[in-house]
């Protein structure tokens, strides 16, 4: 069994059947919804940092240096981590398509229609592109991490090539930061996220990029997927909606 613990925003702790801890997009200490602080985390073996936005990788460096965690990320994110003092040997830089293996886990980066911007301590600005991830776990589970992507038609191809069973899908945006404008939608609307989940052929579509599951976009995403399931029968993705601190276990125990 694989456990997915949700921290709010896009942070997940994945614990594999053999006890390996994989942290995705760690934004914890300044995250008001997080169920714990970085100091309370178990030892983290592997961190996947999809892009340089603060709400996706702010705590990556401190956790990696504490636990000697391996990090998989893009080039601009690597430069930010090096600037923060993270040892280079902990970082594996990659790009779309270049599969890498760390801690016995194969990770295939895929396209994410989103940018990645960082600023180093000397003021240097760097831009890159966000990484989506297909995570191949030892028990055969394949996880897709969307990484703030907008909808794009090649999600169908990602599904055909990789057959992910579980998807971590951005379905909304948190308008909770005073220094950002108020956005009318997330990178995907609830309908687009539901359509993407269907294109990917997911068994379970786990909603993310929020702090409270009472969010209207989250409810709409769940409703649309349930309507798809009623219309199409078996084969449509099952929505998984969690509050921060809750855990989804895959595969579900058969009744």
Q: Model-found features: residue ranges?
A:
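Beta-strand-turn-beta hairpins that frame and shape the catalytic cleft
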Residues: 1-3, 15-22, 99-108, 137-143, ...
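Zn-dependent metallo-beta-lactamase
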Residues: 1-21, 27-32, 110-113, 227, ...
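Pre-active-site segment of Zn-dependent metallo-hydrolases
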Residues: 13-62, 73, 116-120, 125, ...
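Cap/insert and terminal regions of metallo-dependent hydrolase folds
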Residues: 72, 76, 150-246
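Active-site-proximal loop/helix segment associated with metal-binding centers of metalloenzymes
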Residues: 109-141, 149-154, 161-162, 166-168, ...
